[in-house]
Curated annotation (Swiss-Prot):
The keyword Signal does not apply. Its EC number is 4.3.2.10. It comes from Polaromonas sp. (strain JS666 / ATCC BAA-500). Belongs to the HisA/HisF family. It holds the Pfam family His_biosynth. Heterodimer of HisH and HisF. It catalyses: 5-[(5-phospho-1-deoxy-D-ribulos-1-ylimino)methylamino]-1-(5-phospho-beta-D-ribosyl)imidazole-4-carboxamide + L-glutamine = D-erythro-1-(imidazol-4-yl)glycerol 3-phosphate + 5-amino-1-(5-phospho-beta-D-ribosyl)imidazole-4-carboxamide + L-glutamate + H(+). This is Imidazole glycerol phosphate synthase subunit HisF. One of its GO terms (biological process) is L-histidine biosynthetic process.
């Protein structure tokens, strides 16, 4: 069984790491290079950087931050936020990223996933999906499930999250980064039903995201949600737990991890 990964997530805006609740109420968490170096020392398997307002603000890529981080950190870096084209993938890989994450751009132009995957390999291409459980009213007409949101969670696309994940994997995504908007920042645990539904539907790794409040939540994402990796932010940023403590806990739960 492959080792399961713990991935701290750094949401970046205005050159700073921030953390919010349900995609709003942002709170400063520090300097991205300093925080990345700390996680590198703690034994994180990877890091994910998301420029959370790049698409909605129409901003360019955070290349200068990635270059600074890549000069000090020697674990895989995934970068998302404002990634729109195959050329953006090239620029980020040249800056030191190992993977690039598409979100809104894949919704606007699904072909970009095929093109980027064909040019750079599926292992470099992550599709991030921000999903929210349908309201009771919507569920009555469309059935229970989750819709995909774009533009930093501001716009409901009306697409079914499981169907979209399946299409993205088919088009060449090497991983799915799956965030529950309902759970984001709430510390109430992953949406395990969502995680399991997507994990069962696709044949590429799924990274569970949104809602981690304790170490059991991380283990549950793997064992109950079927995720291949778990992503968390606030429990690590504010010093509640270290990555090493998280790995030790997961190992005690019988999950293979790299110590």
């Amino acid at each position: 069984m492959l080792a399961k990964r713990i991935i701290p997530c750094l949401d970046v805006t205005g050159g700073r790491v921030v953390k919010g609740v349900n995609f709003v109420e942002l709170r400063d968490a520090g300097d991205p290079v300093e925080i990345a170096a700390r996680y590198n020392e703690q034994g994180a398997d990877e890091l994910t950087f998301l420029d959370i307002t790049a698409t909605s603000d129409g901003r360019d890529l955070i290349l200068h931050i990635i270059e600074a981080v890549a000069s000090q950190v020697f674990i895989p870096l995934t970068v998302g936020g404002g990634v729109r084209t195959v050329e953006d993938v090239r620029r980020l890989l040249n800056a030191g990223a190992d993977k690039t994450s598409f979100n809104s751009a894949a919704l606007a132009n699904p072909q970009v996933i095929e093109d980027a995957s064909a040019k750079y390999g599926a292992q470099c291409i992550v599709v991030a999906i921000d999903a929210k459980r349908r309201s009771e009213e919507d569920a009555r007409t469309r059935g229970a499930g989750w819709d995909v949101y774009s533009h930093g969670g501001r716009k409901n696309t009306g697409l079914d999250a499981v169907a979209w994940a399946t299409e993205m994997a088919r088009r060449g995504a090497g991983e799915i980064l799956l965030t529950s908007m309902d759970r984001d920042g709430t510390k109430s645990g992953f949406d395990l039903a969502l995680t399991r539904a997507v994990s069962d539907a696709v044949d590429v790794p799924v990274i569970a995201s949104g809602g981690v409040g304790n170490l059991d939540h991380l283990a549950d994402g793997i064992q109950l949600g079927g995720a291949d990796a778990v992503l968390a932010a606030s429990i690590f940023h504010y010093g509640e737990y270290t990555v090493q403590q998280a790995k030790q806990h997961m190992a005690r739960r019988g999950i293979p991890v790299r110590m």
